[in-house]
């Protein structure tokens, strides 16, 4: 948030927070000051700008909805556990830092983590055809990066995963998405968490206009409850005959919706 300058609008800040939350962030820090910054010719701002957001800025009142949504989102996104769909294997010869250009095709619209050979040896077990970590995170599939270096020990572990029923995928292959955005997918971002038998999805509209989103849920639940972050209002979504749902998102609005797959 400290990379946002005074010229940035509430919409800009909302996009920053929403994309961060969709990528797994659970906490954001905003530096604020009550003083009006005053740059001088011989004493310019460091890095060419003031590092803190000025509370005397005339746009401060306009920013309040952004902070309110961000705080409520942070509280919700700390509940339960992350529910990633696939685990991306980068190889045995790469740093833990993810290089975007090396990510495989097929992960768009999915929640994912990355790993190297160390995780294969020390962090992953198979349960019911899924990869499971010691802290209870489950992955539906294991996706290998093209041309990844795989040593003999890691290859043996991957072969064992396959024999145990884990879906081993390669670049371009994918799985059925738990949440499939059918319309305006370029305008929204989302992430998925789980509390016991309850699925929690965060969905945010990045646009400064009202967006009507149509989506499909793999579990096809009978009841989907929606909580609007800013207004606090709650309601249920009805499933259409084609097994899709429709949700209207106001400009720069984020929501959470929940359901229990086995609920009657």
Specify the residue positions occupied by each region the protein language model found:
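Carbohydrate-binding surfaces of carbohydrate-active enzymes
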Residues: 1-264
């Amino acid at each position: 948030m400290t990379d946002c300058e005074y010229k940035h609008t509430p919409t800009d800040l909302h996009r920053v927070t929403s994309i961060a939350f969709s990528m797994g962030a659970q906490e954001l820090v905003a530096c604020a000051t009550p003083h009006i910054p005053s740059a001088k010719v011989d004493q310019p701002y460091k890095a060419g700008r003031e590092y803190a957001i000025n509370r005397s800025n005339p746009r401060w009142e306009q920013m309040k909805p952004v902070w309110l949504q961000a705080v409520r989102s942070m509280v919700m996104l700390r509940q339960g556990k992350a529910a990633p769909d696939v685990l991306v294997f980068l190889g045995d010869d790469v740093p833990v830092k993810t290089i975007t250009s090396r990510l495989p095709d097929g992960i768009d619209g999915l929640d994912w983590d990355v790993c190297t050979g160390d995780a294969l040896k020390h962090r992953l077990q198979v349960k019911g055809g899924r990869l499971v970590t010691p802290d209870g995170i489950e992955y539906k599939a294991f996706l290998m990066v093209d041309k990844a270096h795989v040593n003999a020990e890691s290859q043996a572990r991957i072969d064992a995963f396959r024999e145990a029923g884990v879906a081993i995928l390669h670049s371009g292959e994918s799985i059925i998405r738990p949440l499939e955005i059918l319309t305006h997918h370029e305008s929204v971002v989302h992430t998925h968490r789980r509390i016991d038998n309850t699925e929690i999805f965060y969905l945010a509209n990045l646009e400064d206009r009202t967006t009507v989103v149509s989506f499909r849920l793999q579990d096809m639940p009978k009841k989907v409850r929606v909580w609007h972050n800013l207004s606090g209002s709650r309601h249920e979504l009805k499933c259409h005959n084609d097994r899709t749902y429709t949700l209207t998102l106001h400009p720069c609005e984020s929501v959470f919706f929940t359901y229990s797959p086995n609920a009657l």
